[in-house]
Amino acid sequence: MEADPKVPFTDEMNIQDEHNWESGSWSSSRRSNDSNVTLLSRRSSVEQHEDERQKDSDTLFEHGDAALDAQGIADPRLKDYPIPLVAQTVHLRNDDSEPILTFRVWLLSTFWVLAGCSISTVYYFKPFSVRLSGYVVQLCTWKMGQLLASALPTRPFTVLGRRWTLNPGRWSAKEHALVVIAYWGSSYTAYGLGPLSAMELFYGKRLSSPWAITFLVTTQLTGYGLVGLYRHILVRPPSMYYPGILPTVSLFNAMHGDPRQTASSLRVFMAIASAAFVYQWLPSFVFPLLSSLPLLCWVGRGSWEAFVLGSGSLGFGLMDFSLDWNYVAFLSPLFTPLWANANRFVGAALAVWITYPVAYFSDALGSLRFPPMSSETFDTSGGLYNVSRIMTPSLELNQTALELYSTPRWSFSYAMHFFWGFASASAMVTYAVLFHGRTILKALANVWSLDGNTADDIDSEKDPYVKLTSHHARVPQAWYALLLAVCLCLGTIQLYAGDMQLPWWGLQLVVAISALFTLPCGMLFATANVQIGMDYVSEVLAGALFPGRPVAVLTATVYGRQVLEQCLNLASDLKLGFYMKIPEWELLVAQVYGTLLGPFVNWAVMRLIIDTQGAAALLGREGGDGKRQGLGLGQGGGGGGGGGGQQQRAAGAHTTEWNALKTKNFFSSSVIWGVMGPARVFGGGDGSPSSSSPYRWLLPSGFAVGAAAVLLLWLIHKARPAWRVQQWPLHPAIIFHGASLFPVFPTTNLTSSMAAAVASMGVMRRWHPRWFARWNYLLGAGLDCGAQLVQMVLGVAFLVFNRHGQQMVRMPHWWGNDAVAVDQCFPPPDLPSVIMSPM
C-alpha cells in the first residue's frame, strides 16, 4: 500500500469526513471553506447526528439478521470498508468514559498470569502439554469482573492528590480486554526456560536467580521495542487486520453489548461450547478412534503399502479424516482466510501425498531405513541417535567417537522439512522486498518524523475506526526505543554475568537479523494468519557463527526466535486494542505487566520442580536396573517438535511421571547445531566423513528455490501488468510453509481441517454472508473453548490421580480405543519393523 503525504486532522475535516462516511464513500474529503457556519454549530450538528446514528445502529443490532446487508454488514458507514471481515465484526461504538486501568484489571490480570504461568510451567516438565485456554480465561474473567463490580466497595479514595476507587461501576469491555491481553503476555511458558533448564540439567550450569530472570525478561521484552518501528506498517493500516483476533472481538461484543441485542449470541456461544465440551470427551478419552479414520488403510488392510500411505500417525495420511476438533482446528479453519489455507494445503498435499511417498518407496536418501513420517534423529543403522556416544564426560564433542559412530540421519520427510523451512523464509523476505519494498522504505523513512498523536497512513485518515480513537494519546517512538535499548543493555550484561558463551556482538547481530525478518513475517501474519518465524534460520545461523559453543547457540536461537514472535504478539494485541478502542498507553502497560510478571513465575516453579524432583527423575536417567540410560534424540531433536502430544492423547495412554522432553530437545538441538554444527550436519570440508553428508544440498537449494519462486512471480507481474499478479491467491512462502508443517505434526490434521476451512470461509462466507457475519466467529470460539476445556480437565485429572505408576484415571480398553492400533489401522505381518519402532 503506497503512502501518501500526511494531512493533519482538524475538527472541520473530521466533520466533513463523518458526512462523507454516512453516504458510504471511502474517500478523503477536504475542509469546507464555509465561513458562515461556526465551529461550535458544526460540533452541535455532529453531536446531534451522532445521537441519531447511534439510535439507528442500536435498532440495526436489535433486529439481528434482518439488519444485515447482503454482505453481512450492519452499519452502512462500513459498507465500503476495505476489509469486509472487520466491518462485519468490529462495531463503531465507543464510550471514552469507561474506566480502563482499574483495580479490577490489576487484580484479575495478576491472578490469571500467576495461575496460567504456574500450570504451563508444571506441564513443561510433563510428557504432554496443558495450558489455560485464552477463551476459557476470557469467559471466566467476564463473570469474575461482574462479580467484583457487584461486590467491591464504591467509596472513593484520594491518594497523592489523585481520586480513585476500587469499584468504578459496570464491568467494561475495555477492562475485560486488558485482562485477557495481560494474560496473553505470559500464557505460554517463556521460551528461554528451555535453555536454562538444559544448561542446568545437562551442562551443569545453574544461573543465579537474578540473572536467570533477567535472561527470561529480556528475551520476552526485546521484541516489544521493535513495535514502535513497525507499528505504522503492521498495526495502523486497515489491511493489517490480524484474522486470528476477530473471534475474540466477536466474543467481547457478545459479552458486553446490550443484552437485548446480544442475549441470543451468548446463548448460542454457550450452547456450542457446552456441546463441544461434552462431545470432545469421545475422541479425547472414551472413543479415540474418532480422532483418526484412515479409510485407505482400512480398504487396503493387509497391505503394508496401504498402511504406510493411509496411516495418519505413522504414515502419509492419504484419505485420513478426523472427527476430533483438536485435529480439525489445526489450520484455524474458521478464522484464517481461505486463500491462505488453500496455499498451505497445496504445499502440504504436494509434499506429503506426492513427493514423500515417491521418495520413500524409491528409497531416496535411504528412506526405507527410517519411519516414513518421523521427526526423530537417527544414526546410519536406523536406530535412534545416541548423543551420549559422541560426547566426552565434560559434554564436549568427541571427534573420534563421532567418526566411529555416525553423523545424524533423518527420514526423507524430516530432511525436506528443513528444505521447505529454508525455502519459506527465503520466499517470505524476497516477496516483501520485490512486491512491497518501496512502500516499506517510505514508511520506515517517515517513522521518526510522524507525530505520535495523529494518523500516520493515508488509509488511516479515511478509517472510521481511527476517527473514534484519534484523540487518544499515542506512545512516542522514543519510549519503544528506550525499551529496546534497556533490554539490549541488560541482555548484554547478562551474557557475561551468566557465562552464556555468546559475545555482545552476537546478540546485536541476532537481534538485527530477527528485526529484518520481523517486517515481512508480520505482513504475512497480519493478512494471512500465518507466522513463518525464524526457527530454521536462527538455529543454522547460530551454529555457523558459534561452532563448538552449545550454550551460545541456545542463547542466540532464543533471542532470534523470540524477538520476532514477541514483536508480532504485541502488534497483534495493539490491533485488538484498536478494535476495542483502548488507548495505546494503557494497552502497552497491561501487556508489559503480564509479560514481566510471567518469567518470575516460570523461574520459581522451575526451581521448585528441579530442586524437589532432581535431574534423574526429570531426565529418566535411571532404568529398571538402576543403570544410567543413554540419551537419544527424541522427536524434534533436530530443531522441530510437536504433534506427538496429540497422538499420545488420542491413544488415551497418559503417564504423568516427570519427563523433561522439551528440555531434552533443547539439549539435543544444542548438540546438533552447537557441538557438531551445521558444517557437519549439512556437509563440510573438514575432512571428516560428514563431508559427504547426504543433506549438503538442503540449505543452499532451499534458499535458492524460495527466492526463485518469488522472482518468477515478480517477473510475470512486470511483464504482464494486466494479469494483476498481486491479486492472485498465490503466495510461494505460504505454500512452502505448508509443506514444512509435516512430519512435525501428524498428517491426520490435514484433510479435515481444510474441509472445515472450505465450509466456513468458502461456502458459508460466500453463499450465506449474513449467517457467517453473525455466527461464524462465535461458532469457532465456542468449539475451541469446549475442546480446550476438556484437555485442561483431563490434564489436571491425570496430574492429580495418575501418579507413581498408578492409572486411576483411564478408559478401559475396548474396540474404540484398541491398545495396538487406536485407529484400527493394524500393521500387516510383512510391515518393516523400522516403521513401528526404530532399533
From Swiss-Prot:
Which terms in the GO cellular component ontology are assigned? membrane
Biased composition annotated in UniProt, kind: Gly residues: 629-646
Where do the segments described as Disordered lie? 1-58, 629-654
InterPro entries for the chain: Oligpept_transpt, OPT
Keywords (A to Z) from UniProt: Glycoprotein, Membrane, Peptide transport, Protein transport, Transmembrane, Transmembrane helix, Transport, Virulence
Q: Which domain of life is it from?
A: Eukaryota
User: Pfam family example for this protein?
Assistant: OPT
**Family note:** Belongs to the oligopeptide OPT transporter family.
Q: Specify the protein name.
A: Oligopeptide transporter phomP2
